[in-house]
UniProtKB/Swiss-Prot annotation:
Its cofactor is Mg(2+). Belongs to the dGTPase family. Type 1 subfamily. This is Deoxyguanosinetriphosphate triphosphohydrolase. It comes from the Bacteria. SMART domains: HDc. Pfam families: HD, HD_assoc. It comes from Yersinia pseudotuberculosis serotype O:1b (strain IP 31758). Homotetramer. Residues 66-274 form the HD domain. The keyword Magnesium applies. CDD domains: HDc (cd00077).
């Protein structure tokens, strides 16, 4: 496997720092320890403790938040990374693959990507995501604005983004921005958060590891079959496009390819949440362990002694009877289920990484590590199917998701007057911190966080010298991003309380 040299991928350069060099192993390790400190101490990580995993607004601390889920993903990611490196050592490939000074960074990058992987998710999880997209899609009408010429079906409600006769280049930009704003995605928001909002100045390698999908949010062309998995969701926004281009150059990544260690982070997430969602459902009394076993065995089909289901799920269930009366049988069942599952799936993920190393290294491997015809992947899929059928469709979960959708939609309605302001008026409001003719908008602006307001101001300053028509389009884009940034950064409880306060429901 010539051409595989991880020194080409594990870059310790940072976007806001001068180029640096680190020769010995400890110096290189220190660079990535700095990344760890920046990430662990960031407000985005702390906010995960009050963001939904499955059950919004949950008061039972035993039920997972995004933070506790991310800690579990971090542990599994570390395990997979160690398994891969151990196999490289056994095959005497460490030096051949350029890893002799990069063993600790290899693990650290994976661990921190696992910890960060959900930081871009809005309140109320995927329903919060859907609320943002639906709200902006209704106003942007992205499909009505495809192409470079106006269409009679165009229903865009934003004057500056409507397509105009004879303005081909501006219309292409308008269409791109309408698509971009209608494609809010947690993974893309994570890239924006660490680079544009928090300015953590992480190494390119560390950020590359959370670039899970490789399609820009504004993409409207057909997706090439060679990358239909890697491009199935937006991975970054137009606002971060230049940064992502820098990142790709620094990490030697082709346009739609992935960073190799991202596959490990993705596998760790798949392994962790498939068990966690079921355990939380038992904690919430949605079903019992016995009912869960029945659901899983029905999905598996005929169980034979010694097959993977019997070794993993059956063995954990048999342990249930032995522990009865001595300790919490439910806790013991899930401990054994987790140990058995991780013990089978982690080596399988590591083996898949190694078997497909050339494509994984280049980033063109167009599937997840845990996506094949093996029994291990079948087991993972039955966990997911049981969760979809019996957890996500449960009335309590659906009721909370509907509430979350309404909260996020309502907050967007409340803050929409800021988007309706003329560009000159909003610019004056930002500069003076008040506008006499817009008292409601002034008070809404004051509620936005300083961090998000500064990010908007910096973006507006960068585009200041553009021709006026382009400036107005980009200014609206960054203003809409400002509102998305603020609302998506809320915790579940803060969003719920803010909605009630502003609706005078208290």
């Amino acid at each position: 496997m010539s051409g595989i040299d991880f020194k080409q991928k594990i870059s310790f350069q940072r976007p806001f720092s001068k180029p640096s060099s680190a020769e010995d192993e400890y110096e290189i390790t220190r660079v990535f320890e700095s990344d760890r400190g920046r990430i662990v101490n960031s407000a985005a990580i702390r906010r995960l403790q009050q963001k939904t995993q499955v059950f919004p607004l949950e008061r039972n601390a035993a039920v997972r938040s995004r933070l506790t889920h991310s800690l579990e993903v971090q542990q599994v990611g570390r395990y997979i990374a160690k398994e891969i490196l151990n196999r490289f050592k056994q095959d005497k490939k460490i030096t051949a693959y350029g890893l002799d000074k990069l063993l600790d960074p290899f693990e650290s990058i994976v661990e921190m990507a696992c910890l960060m992987h959900d930081i871009g998710n809005p309140p109320f999880g995927h329903f919060g995501e859907s609320a943002i997209n639906d709200w902006f899609t209704k106003r942007m009408d992205p499909n009505g604005g495809s192409g470079s010429e106006p269409q009679s079906t165009d229903q865009c409600q934003v004057e500056v983004l409507k397509l105009c006769e004879g303005e081909t280049e501006l219309n292409i930009l308008r269409s791109k921005i309408r698509h971009d704003l209608s494609q809010f995605e947690g993974n893309a928001q994570a890239i924006r958060l660490v680079h544009s909002l928090l300015k953590l100045n992480l190494t390119y390698a560390q950020v590359g590891c959370i670039l899970k999908y490789t399609k820009p949010a504004y993409w409207s062309a057909p997706i090439p079959a060679s990358h239909n998995y890697l491009m199935k969701k937006p991975g970054f926004y137009l606002a971060e496009e230049n940064y992502v281009k820098e990142l790709r150059r620094e990490l030697n990544m082709e346009e739609f390819d992935r960073f190799p260690l991202t596959y490990i982070m993705e596998a760790a997430d798949d392994i962790s949440y498939c068990i966690a969602d079921l355990e939380d459902a038992v904690e919430k009394n949605i079903f019992s362990v016995e009912q869960l076993y029945d659901h899983m065995s029905q999905e598996w089909g005929a169980v034979t002694p010694g097959d993977l289901f019997d070794k993993v799920v059956g063995a954990a269930f048999r342990q249930l009877g032995r522990e009865q009366g001595r300790r919490s049988s439910e806790d013991q069942f899930f401990m054994y289920l987790r140990v058995n599952t991780v013990g089978k799936l982690v080596p399988h993920a590591a083996q898949r990484f190694i078997e497909n190393l050339p494509a994984v290294f280049s980033g063109s491997f167009n599937q997840a590590l845990l996506e094949d015809s093996s029994a291990a992947c079948k087991l993972l899929q039955i966990f997911k199917r049981v969760a979809v059928k019996h957890v996500f469709n449960h009335p309590e979960v659906e009721q909370l998701e509907l509430q979350g959708y309404r909260v996020i939609s309502g907050l967007l309605d409340i803050y929409s007057p800021l988007l309706a302001m003329p560009e000159t008026a909003f610019t004056q409001l930002v500069a003076d911190d008040r506008h006499r003719k817009y008292p409601i908008e002034t008070r809404l602006f004051h509620k936005l966080s300083i961090k998000h307001r500064l990010a908007y101001a910096e973006s507006a300053e960068r585009i200041r010298n553009l021709p006026s028509e382009q400036y107005e389009i980009y200014e609206y884009y960054y203003r809409a991003r400002l509102i998305q940034d603020y609302i998506s950064g809320m915790t579940d409880l803060y969003a719920y309380d803010e909605y009630r306060r502003l609706m005078a429901a208290e």
